[in-house]
Amino acid sequence: MNLHEYQSKQIFAQYDLPVSKGYPCETVEQALKAIEKLGGDQWVAKCQVYAGGRGKAGGVKVVSSEAEVRSFFERFLGKRLVTLQTDAQGQPVNTIYLEACAAVKKELYVGMVIDRANRRIVFMASTEGGVNIEEVAEKTPHLLHKVAIDPFMGAQPFQGRELACKLGLTGKQIHQFAHIFCRLSKMFSEKDLSLVEINPLVILQNDDLHCLDAKIVVDGNALYRHADLKSLQDPSQEDPREAEAEALGLNYVALDGNIGCMVNGAGLAMGTMDIIKLQGGLPANFLDVGGSATKERVAGAFKIILSDTNVKAILVNIFGGIVRCDLIAEGIVAAVNEVGVTVPVVVRLEGNNAERGREILAQSGLNIIAAESLKDAAVQAVNAAK
């Protein structure tokens, strides 16, 4: 689960991490009061959306007057911001964060992720702040320094000091960086996070370190023990189809293709998407109905898939292990009748009660294309979508 920047900075402040004073604003009136409270003659206005790349899209700007604040709010508030990380529709800007402008001397990068291969939380830092860190990791990996956090001992100050020296920090900056290193690591573990980024962590003109940005992603599987974080979720930033799928117990991710996919099992779902691509098609979604699929969930899955107007065909690929193919077949028939599916539906059933499932589909009288194999199913779906 993503958090907005202003929410992330509020959590940063709880852990004694240096952040700028700021106010989230939902109206121009709130914004004018905010700059009055902040004082000074320059402020930074930041559109609050989950996606990155706001700056290049114009969603982050230094403003120097009430007129510029009004202009920025009129341009973005209530509109949708399109960045390199969003689709063509963008994400809605319901809140704009106003904070004091900082005098920056140098930009650094700091981040934390879970290294699943090594089963460790990894702290990363680089002198290349304020840029796409993926490019740094790919083109100049020697500039991205990493420290693995021991799960029993936790982050140690000496590790932070060593990392600070690698970044070329000196004097009080070494102590400040060690503090940020330890507090950030503590926050990561206590809040069950899966990602933290400060891009950039800056050196101010007075040589202090300061968190100019803040990004937090919470492990969704741990939200049951973090009601305070769960309450921060902003449904408007998420695809409504994905929210509906979550309510039905389905795993759904929208994509840009035109072949809808309904599969049981994440691995089989990814394999199905791969073979569609291999046959020259483009999957419109990832959808895993899970091992306890019911008629209602199958019908719900069809509705979600068909809510995407780009879908020209649907491929249903079910391997009956825990789930019975005959129940899936009944769900498909019920869904097609209920929803009124107008696009071709290709079905491949294998495993538990697969033969009975095929009989149900054949006797339904519906225009459902039966496939003999996964490759055959992909070929027929690609042809049907043309």
From Swiss-Prot:
Catalytic activity: succinate + ATP + CoA = succinyl-CoA + ADP + phosphate; GTP + succinate + CoA = succinyl-CoA + GDP + phosphate
A Pfam family reported for this protein in Swiss-Prot or TrEMBL: ATP-grasp_2
GO terms classed as biological process: succinyl-CoA metabolic process; tricarboxylic acid cycle
Binding site for Mg(2+): 199, 213
Binding site for ATP: 46, 53-55, 99, 102, 107
Known cofactor(s): Mg(2+)
Binding residue positions for substrate: 264, 321-323
Cofactor note: Binds 1 Mg(2+) ion per subunit.
Enzyme nomenclature, EC number: 6.2.1.5
Keywords: ATP-binding, Ligase, Magnesium, Metal-binding, Nucleotide-binding, Tricarboxylic acid cycle
GO cellular component, one term: cytosol
GO terms for MF: ATP binding; magnesium ion binding; succinate-CoA ligase (ADP-forming) activity; succinate-CoA ligase (GDP-forming) activity
Pathway: Carbohydrate metabolism; tricarboxylic acid cycle; succinate from succinyl-CoA (ligase route): step 1/1
Subunit structure and binding partners: Heterotetramer of two alpha and two beta subunits.
Function: Succinyl-CoA synthetase functions in the citric acid cycle (TCA), coupling the hydrolysis of succinyl-CoA to the synthesis of either ATP or GTP and thus represents the only step of substrate-level phosphorylation in the TCA. The beta subunit provides nucleotide specificity of the enzyme and binds the substrate succinate, while the binding sites for coenzyme A and phosphate are found in the alpha subunit.
Family stated for the protein in its record: Belongs to the succinate/malate CoA ligase beta subunit family.
Listed PANTHER family: SUCCINATE--COA LIGASE [GDP-FORMING] SUBUNIT BETA, MITOCHONDRIAL, SUCCINYL-COA SYNTHETASE BETA CHAIN
Protein's name according to its UniProt entry: Succinate--CoA ligase [ADP-forming] subunit beta
Gene responsible for this protein: sucC
